[in-house]
Amino acid sequence: MDLPGLIHDFLLVFLGLGLILGGLGVVLLPNPIYSAFSLGLVFVCISLFYILSNSHFVAAAQLLIYVGAINVLIIFAVMFINGSEYSKDFHLWTVGDGITSVVCTSLFVSLITTIPDTSWYGIIWTTKANQIIEQDLISNSQQIGIHLSTDFFLPFEFISIILLVALIGAIAVARQ
């Protein structure tokens, strides 16, 4: 989306705050229904980020797959869980929460200090448009594949990491 700089920056900050608040809601809200709706907010904000970066196909796929399927499935599964077991024995803060907070905060600080010092020349070099062959000689699905492996490589990898974490979490919950 081609927006003036000030409006674009405002929308980025607004969506970033939505992501942060939604992520905190997923983790901190004791009711699983509210956590699932917060996860839906996170997915919608990510989709809007993709729209701001002019990747409309990835935004549509994000909305259809994550909000339309995964989040609805999570809400449907949570509806069958007995809600009374979550309300009893609720402790505001435990030792595990403290350890997790320290680990997440240290990881966040290390990322914040590492990312500005990283040379992104190699990543920018692989996403140059002149490396892509003639656009007229390939089909639309091949163009999507080329863009996913060049221009949208990092978002594609982030999505695969999120799916891996969700799979590991589902296995851990199923084993208990």
From Swiss-Prot:
- Which keywords, in A-to-Z order, does the entry hold? Chloroplast, Membrane, NAD, NADP, Plastid, Plastoquinone, Quinone, Thylakoid, Translocase, Transmembrane, Transmembrane helix, Transport
Instruction: Respond yes or no to whether keyword Transcription is given for this record.
Output: no
- Catalysed reaction equations from the record: a plastoquinone + NADH + (n+1) H(+)(in) = a plastoquinol + NAD(+) + n H(+)(out); a plastoquinone + NADPH + (n+1) H(+)(in) = a plastoquinol + NADP(+) + n H(+)(out)
Q: Sorted alphabetically, which InterPro entries does this protein's record hold?
A: NAD(P)H-Q_Oxidoreduct_6, NADH_UbQ/plastoQ_OxRdtase_su6, Nuo/plastoQ_OxRdtase_6_NuoJ
Protein EC = 7.1.1.-
Give the highest taxon in the source lineage: Eukaryota
Which Pfam families does the UniProt entry name for this protein? Oxidored_q3
One GO CC term on file: chloroplast thylakoid membrane
Q: Identify the enzyme class.
A: translocase
Which residue ranges does UniProt annotate as crossing the membrane?
10-30, 32-52, 61-81, 92-112, 152-172
Q: How does it sit in the membrane?
A: Multi-pass membrane protein
Any one GO MF annotation of this record: quinone binding
Places the protein is found: Plastid, Chloroplast thylakoid membrane
Quote the subunit structure annotation. NDH is composed of at least 16 different subunits, 5 of which are encoded in the nucleus.
Functional summary from the UniProt entry = NDH shuttles electrons from NAD(P)H:plastoquinone, via FMN and iron-sulfur (Fe-S) centers, to quinones in the photosynthetic chain and possibly in a chloroplast respiratory chain. The immediate electron acceptor for the enzyme in this species is believed to be plastoquinone. Couples the redox reaction to proton translocation, and thus conserves the redox energy in a proton gradient.
Q: Which family does it belong to?
A: Belongs to the complex I subunit 6 family.
Q: What is this protein called?
A: NAD(P)H-quinone oxidoreductase subunit 6, chloroplastic
Q: Which organism is it from?
A: Lactuca sativa
Query: Lineage of this protein's species?
Result: Eukaryota, Viridiplantae, Streptophyta, Embryophyta, Tracheophyta
Q: Which gene encodes it?
A: ndhG
